[in-house]
Each structure stands twice: as structure tokens, then as C-alpha cells.
């Protein structure tokens, strides 16, 4: 009876101290109640000794992983007329109260079911038809080592690709034919990745280990702890070890959105993209501010230069910026029409046209002929003439086709009678009939409707209370120091940040 167990693959559980051993049964001694395994694996790792022996007192549980072919044939010979299944003996611990017959199986041992004649026999390749769904890595290596007639699959080889899936060439068993050397070759040169690649990943089992509800509740509790920076709290409170990406370690002061206050609130207030409130100022306060800045050294020439730079930067952005002004688009240079009057606002427009012409923009400057011009206009015209831009004094010489942008500098803050001049009306009509968008530089505050409907308006410093016809307001920083604002009664903190021109939103 003991010989029936030889050749079977078993897994022996010896408790938490000794662990689990797996291997092929080499001998069973009923007298001394011992069992020996060859090619053993201890906890999935192959042992260094070729054989280990276990006493029945150390065995907690014994499982049969694979029944050898000889055991099945013996069972069929002993009971051919039996029922569909035959019970195989089970080696376990000796019962404490047992008398004679030391080879008996314990009462609580589970019988092993052996298939009858109707079930399929072993295949020619020596692979057992019994499914092995829960074998460990070490158990599968035992299967590969003890299958005498099995074959080992090789990836990327011609022989395995030419044969069909069931046309395996059986190995020759025995020491004569080099079976022992073949096993050594497999241990030395074999890649253990074949069995790993055949194993399917258990998605459902791993998903069951993830407690999704607990993780979501932890995230929600961390989000409910507070919005913004954490406070220090009382000494008894535990400071959290981790902060969110939008939290500050140091306490932040509350944001003050009204950082600019004026002595007389204008009729309009604006706000920046970050929420800062920018109040408008009257034209009288605007004049006092420019006069105070000029007395401290911010001359008219400096102001014209700063206004021209800021206006040209905004115009270049409106024209397309780096997407339009590239060396590959030399054949598609943008065209800008400048409409200027004989005043300081016109000089600001000429300065803007000079900077645009320096950036490879085709500029057409309209300026009516006057016997006497302001000195600022004369100096700006001299510089503009060196850029290659075109200067016209008649509206008929302006482009007939739509241009890319129209810059309006026709209006003056103080000379409102210019609107009645023929050249002014003709230039305003041309701008309204042209399909190009209009940018107004430093438009005035007047009760009348704007002669030229603008899409954008550029203001110097703090904006004026402009009407809806001025379009969207963009203030520009012309370099007025903070103490100059304080001299005229304005509490000022720069809303520009890292830019010189920012958009404003009407409140």
C-alpha cells in the first residue's frame, strides 16, 4: 500500500514554524511513520538538498497535487468493478489513541477522488488532464521536473513555430538518453518566464483588495478640512503632516481687492482678471497727475515714448503676435492705418506707428496738413520718416481695401471743435466704412457719442469713465511713481503685475 504513494506530487503543511514543502514522494515508511520527498521546494524556493524526510507528528496537512500514472493504473487493477470513483489512501498523523496498524489514515482525512475509466486518460505528451488552477510557482516547477515525457516550450524558435499546438516531440527518458543531463541544462539555462507569461493576472482578486469606499471617504474628509491655508490651531491639535497643493504652510494675509482709492470716486469702476478694483478718475484729476509727474522729471517726450511702446505692444498682440509676425510670413505682413490729429494724442499715435514700423508692420499714417505743428508732432514725424512708413494727408490716399487694424488718435481731450473739421469727418467715415477693428489711444471723455466706434481703448495710468462706444478698456503703465499718485491724493498700488498693459472689466 505504501508503494502506491511513490511518484505522487504532494504539498505538506508543517505549521507556521516549518512552513510548506512540495515535492515528489520518494518513499513512505509505515513503521516509523515518515514520508520522504525528492526535489523538494520549501515555501516556493527549491531546497539545496535532494531529499527531505518528514515525521507524521510534524505534518499538519497533506494535499495531493498530482497523482502519478502508476497509482492510477494500480487503482484500476485493484477495483475494476467498483463504482465511478475510488478512494485512495491518505497518509496523515498517527492518532493519539490508535493501537495497531500504524499505516491507517486518520478519521478526519479527506479522501482523494481518482477518475474512472470514463474519464480521459493521460495524454501522450505526459501532461495530466487534471486542471491546476491554484498551483504556486514552486509547484509548477515540480510539474516540469517530474514529467518524464513532457516537453519544454521555447519562444522565438523555429521548431516550436512549425509544429502544431498538440504535435509535441516527446523527450527520451532515462539516464542512458541523457535525461539527467537534460534536467541540469534546464536548471542552468532554462528561463523561468515561460510559466510566468502563461499565468493570467487576477483582476477581480486584486480589485477586491482595494477598499474604494475607504479611500474616497479619506479624500472627502481631507477636502472638508478647509479651503485655503490651514491655521496653526491650538497646541492640543495635531498638525497634519501633509498639505494639499493649494495650501500654504505659512499663514497668508487676507487679500485686499480695493488697493487703489481716489479722493473723488468716479462714475465708473473696473476690475482686473485677479479681482482687483481699479476706479476711474476725472479728466481734471488726470491732468493734475500728469502735471505732477512732469514736474518730477517725467517729461512729455518720455510719456510719448512709453505710450508708443505700450500701444505698439498691444497692437502687435492684436495682429497675431508670434503666430503672425514670423520670418515665414514675410509675404503676409500686416497693414495698420493710423489716424492722427494735430495734438498730443496724435503725437502718441505717431510714436506707436514708429514702433510698429520697426517690427516689420506696414504703417499708413494719416495726418492733416497744418501750417504750424506742435513741437512734439514735428519731432515724432522726423523719426517716423526714417522707418519707411507711408505718410498721407488726404483720406483718398488711404487704402481702399480693408486693413488689419485701425488706430484712432483723432480726438483731443480739450479741443472738441476738431469734430467739425472736414478732414476729421472724412477720416471718421473712412474708419467706420472699413471692416478692420479699431483701437483708440487715450480717448477723451465727452457727452457726445464717439465718431469712430472702437473695439478697444488704451488709457494712460488710471482709466477715465469712458462710455460703451470706447469698447473694452486697457490701461497702460507709463511709469508714474507711487509718491506722485500720493501727491494728488490717490492711494495707489500697481495692478499691472508683470505686464504693462492689462484688460479691465466693467463693474
Curated annotation (Swiss-Prot):
UniProt-annotated location(s): Cytoplasm, P-body
GO biological process: deadenylation-independent decapping of nuclear-transcribed mRNA; P-body assembly
Residue segments, region Disordered: 75-113, 154-182, 220-248
Disulfide bonds: none
Location of the Sm domain: 1-68
Region (Required for P-body targeting and interaction with DCP1A): 1-77
Residue span of region Required for interaction with DDX6: 188-295
Gene3D superfamilies in UniProt: 2.30.30.100, YjeF N-terminal domain
YjeF N-terminal domain sequence ranges: 282-486
Gene Ontology terms, MF aspect: mRNA binding
Keywords recorded for this protein, A-Z: Cytoplasm, Phosphoprotein, RNA-binding
Keyword Methyltransferase in annotation: no
One GO CC term on file: P-body
Pfam families, per database record: Edc3_linker, FDF, LSM14, YjeF_N
Residues modified to Phosphoserine: 128
Transmembrane segments: none
Polar residues bias spans: 75-87, 157-170
Domain DFDF residues, every copy: 189-225
Main subcellular location: cytoplasm
Domain description: The DFDF domain is unstructured by itself. It assumes a helical fold upon interaction with other proteins.
Reported function: Binds single-stranded RNA. Involved in the process of mRNA degradation and in the positive regulation of mRNA decapping.
Family: Belongs to the EDC3 family.
Protein name: Enhancer of mRNA-decapping protein 3
Biological source species: Danio rerio
